[in-house]
Regions:
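Conserved small/polar residues in nucleotide/adenosyl-binding loops
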Residues: 147-149
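Conserved, mostly hydrophobic/aromatic
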Residues: 19, 99, 142
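N-terminal low-complexity or amphipathic/hydrophobic leaders
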Residues: 20-61
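Anion (oxyanion) recognition and catalysis
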Residues: 44, 126-134
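Active-site beta->alpha loop and helix N-cap motifs at the rims of alpha/beta catalytic domains
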Residues: 46-122, 138
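Hydrophobic, aromatic-enriched interface-forming segments
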Residues: 131-145
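N-terminal amphipathic alpha-helix/helix-capping segment at the start of soluble metabolic enzymes
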Residues: 1-22, 62-69
Length: 149
């Protein structure tokens, strides 16, 4: 499967419904996300196109998506609420070459605009994007603003 096929799988006809469940690495337990297997089974049954999750979740639960229209995207950015003033600094915890062996079809990472570490996060996103290019993987960015207008 090439990049275009993977992208079409995630965004049939250029559109898709994705659900991020990547929060467990940052802050667990979160109400509604404590039964990971049950959540994923529900999302697959609902016919979502993509589930965005941390790499361990994808490795452990990707088999639940087999034979369905649902694919998994590995979110490689992590920080925790316990990091205090550095909690918004998302670091990359893997590489694009892990995606296919773990059962994913794309990569995702996050940049928090307005964070003191914004430039470093953008640089990390660029490095992951380069890896995704070389592995024929779609790359998705979660770009959030920490600036309240």
């Amino acid at each position: 499967m090439n990049k275009a096929d993977r992208l079409n799988q995630l965004l049939p006809n250029g559109r898709g419904v994705w659900i991020p469940i990547d929060h467990g690495a940052s802050d667990f337990p979160i109400p509604g996300l404590t039964d990971t297997e049950g959540v994923i089974k529900s999302l697959v049954a609902a016919g979502v196109d993509g589930i965005v999750a941390q790499k361990g979740v994808v490795s452990h639960y990707q088999h639940l998506c087999e034979g369905s229209r649902t694919s998994m995207v590995i979110h490689f950015s992590v920080s925790t609420r316990h990091a205090g003033p550095d909690a918004a600094n998302k670091v990359i915890v893997g590489h694009a070459d892990e995606v296919i062996p773990r059962g994913g079809v794309g990569v995702s990472c996050q940049v928090n605009m307005g964070s003191p570490n914004e430039a470093a996060m953008i640089e990390r996103m660029g490095q992951l994007s380069r890896e995704a290019l070389h592995h024929e993987l779609p790359m998705f960015g979660m770009v959030l603003s920490l600036i309240h207008i």
